[in-house]
Amino acid sequence: MGGYPLISVKQQSFFDCGVACLKSLFLYHGLFFNLPRRKKRLRGYSLYELFKLADQQGIQAFVYRSSSFDVDCIPCLVQLSHMGLGHYVVVYGYRVNQIQIMDPSVGRIYWISETKFQRLWSGLFLVLADKNSL
């Protein structure tokens, strides 16, 4: 993992959670995140669009689907699903039965139970290439 502090980023609009999470990951890795100008969105970003945004910044990212969460992928951007709505958070830590997340909807980092995380997690996550290989 990077030697940088955990970075909390608050999303600017209802549809910016993915971009806020990507920015948090970039800053965690000590990377500059230059978001290109964009029109007002009427929907959120797909994981593929976030993958492409990382690529446009010159950073290699990987998207995975899994039925069980692998703590070796931390830190990573994950997709949650709650009441039919998608939401992105960054997973920054793990301890017995708890997952540490950065939630851009509130702009802070906190712990949730692993049970709650598993219930909400869609099985999708995005990982930036290791800093040493960037």
What are the residue ranges of the model-derived segments?
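Conserved active-site-adjacent core of cysteine acyl-enzyme catalytic domains
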Residues: M1-N132
